C-alpha cells in the first residue's frame, strides 16, 4: 500500500489557506492526501468536496483555549477520544507523515502522529507568535517551518501556483491593499 500524507489544521482561513497550498503541492506530485479538520469552523466549507483528497474527515472538535475549567476538561477528553480515532485511521491508510498547520482542528491528528511509532510530524506556523497547539507539539516534531524563526529550514509562506499564473505587471500602481487576519 502506498504512503498517504495527512494534512491537518484549520478553524480559520489563515490556517486553511496554508493547508490548501500543501494539499495542492502533494496532489500535483501524485501523493495521496487525507485532510483531517473539524466539523466546527470553516474546514468543511473548504475541503468537504475537494477532489484532490483521498479522504476528508471532519471531527467534532473544539478549542481548549478560552474555556472555563469544566469546559477545558470536556475539550481535552474529546481530543483524547478523537486522537484514538486518528490512530486507527493512520494504521488503515499507512500514514507515516503528518503536516499540521495548527488551529484547534489539528489537535487530535497532531497528537496521534506523536503517538504513532514511525510517523513524522511537520508543523507549519504561519503566525509571528506560535499558537498553543504548535508550541506544545513542536518539541515532538521532525521539523517546524516558520517565516518568523531564523532557525527554520523553510521560511517561505506556501502560496498557490495560481497566484503566479494570474499575476500581471502593471505600469503604474495606484493602490495597494493588504487583507488578512485569523479569520482569513
Question: Which residues fall in each region the model found?
Answer:
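Short beta->alpha connector loops at strand-helix junctions that form conserved
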Residues: 58-62, 101, 124-127
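Cofactor-binding loop segments of dinucleotide-utilizing enzymes, especially the Rossmann-like FAD-
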Residues: 10, 38-40, 61, 126, ...
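Conserved nucleotide-sugar phosphate-binding/catalytic loop shared by glycosyltransferases and other
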Residues: 2-12, 27-78
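Active-site-proximal region of nucleotide-activated glycan assembly enzymes
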Residues: 31-32, 53-54, 114-166
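Conserved donor-binding/catalytic core segment of Leloir-type glycosyltransferases
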Residues: 170-183
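Short amphipathic alpha-helix
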Residues: 15-26
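Glycosyltransferases and closely related glycan-assembly transferases
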Residues: 3, 49-54, 84-99, 107-122, ...
